[in-house]
Each structure stands twice: as structure tokens, then as C-alpha cells.
């Protein structure tokens, strides 16, 4: 009986981190630029930055990386009509500017389904960045390009631990 409990606890120990969810951060109309938006103090901690974007809407936020950290950013939208039927030119434009000023435009190079069990929400992955990061503060800009509101999520980081957000 004790061995079975220890085995179950061991399995639970290894499975629990896989079931963790990104910490939500919701952007609103006050977060029009990265400087006005929140700062994710550690960009390796997993966050889900949410914004509803229509034509002309602008949102921004920042995150920091240290030396040798991995830059991990994913662009998702909620998989619902009519937003999931928009052409790439109608979807929100997302740019990531590194601390050296290099601008990366997230290109729509996939439409991979993802079911998030905690909220019961279906998403579509549209783009992912995964590369060696540069030490310093990154700036993310989000711009709506269609009259259809698009529930947009920028997932940052990969470590499922509690993180700090500064406004």
C-alpha cells in the first residue's frame, strides 16, 4: 500500500508540471504601447498576454531576458468564427523588438489546433519564435487590422513558475 502511494505520488510529481497553464495578463486600451503596457520581469516564465484587437487597436507590453535565456514567443487566436476565417492580411500584426533594436514580425506560418483544458478553449497557433535571446528588454507591439474583433494571445516563456508583472 505504501509502495503504491509512493508510486502514485511520483507519477503525480512528473505529470503536474505538464498540466500547468500560462499566467494570464490582460491588455486594455491603456496599454497602447510597450512603454504603457506591463513589464513581464522574467521572460522565461510562462505568461499568456491577452488582447481583443480590431482595426486600429494597438496594444503593447515588454519582457526581460537575461544572458543565455531562450526567446520563446507564440501567437495564438481563439478558434472561433469569424476570426478563425480571416486571411493573414486581416489578422493582427505582431512585432517583437529585441534590446538591440532588431524588429521581428511574426509571420503566419501555421494553423495548428490547440485545446486549453483549464478554460475549455480551442486556439489556433499562427506563429512561434524559439531562439537564443539577447539580454535586456524586449518590446511587443500588437495592431488590429480588420473590423472583426480577434481574441489574440501572445504566449511568452516556457517555465511554469509564478512570475512578476509590473505596470
Which stretches of residues belong to each language-model region?
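Contiguous segments within soluble domain cores/interaction surfaces
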Residues: 24-27, 75-115
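Bacterial N-terminal signal peptides
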Residues: 3-14
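Hydrophobic beta-strand segments within beta-rich accessory/binding domains
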Residues: 60-85, 138-145
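Beta-sandwich interaction modules
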Residues: 114-133
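Residues that act as N-cap/strand-start positions at coil-to-secondary-structure junctions
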Residues: 45, 55-57, 88-90, 124-125
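Non-catalytic extracellular/lumenal accessory regions of secreted precursors
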Residues: 18-59, 108-109, 159-167
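C-terminal edge strands of extracellular/lumenal beta-sandwich accessory domains
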Residues: 22-33, 61, 89-101, 129-167
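Solvent-exposed loop and beta-edge segments used for protein-protein assembly and interaction
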Residues: 55-57, 65-67, 86-88, 118, ...
Amino acid at each position: 500500500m505504501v509502495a503504491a502511494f509512493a508510486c502514485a505520488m511520483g507519477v503525480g510529481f512528473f505529470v503536474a508540471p505538464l498540466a500547468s497553464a500560462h499566467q494570464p495578463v490582460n491588455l486594455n486600451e491603456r496599454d497602447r504601447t510597450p512603454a504603457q503596457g506591463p513589464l513581464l520581469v522574467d521572460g522565461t516564465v510562462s505568461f499568456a498576454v491577452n488582447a481583443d484587437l480590431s482595426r486600429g487597436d494597438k496594444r503593447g507590453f515588454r519582457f526581460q531576458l537575461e544572458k543565455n535565456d531562450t526567446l520563446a514567443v507564440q501567437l495564438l487566436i481563439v478558434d472561433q468564427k469569424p476570426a478563425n476565417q480571416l486571411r493573414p492580411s486581416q489578422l493582427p500584426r505582431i512585432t517583437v523588438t529585441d534590446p538591440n533594436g532588431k524588429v521581428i514580425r511574426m509571420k503566419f506560418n501555421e494553423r495548428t489546433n490547440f485545446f486549453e483544458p483549464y478554460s475549455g478553449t480551442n486556439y489556433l497557433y499562427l506563429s512561434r519564435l524559439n531562439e537564443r535571446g539577447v539580454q535586456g528588454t524586449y518590446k511587443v507591439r500588437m495592431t488590429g487590422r480588420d473590423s472583426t474583433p480577434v481574441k489574440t494571445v501572445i504566449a511568452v516563456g516556457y517555465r511554469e513558475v509564478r512570475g512578476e508583472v509590473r505596470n
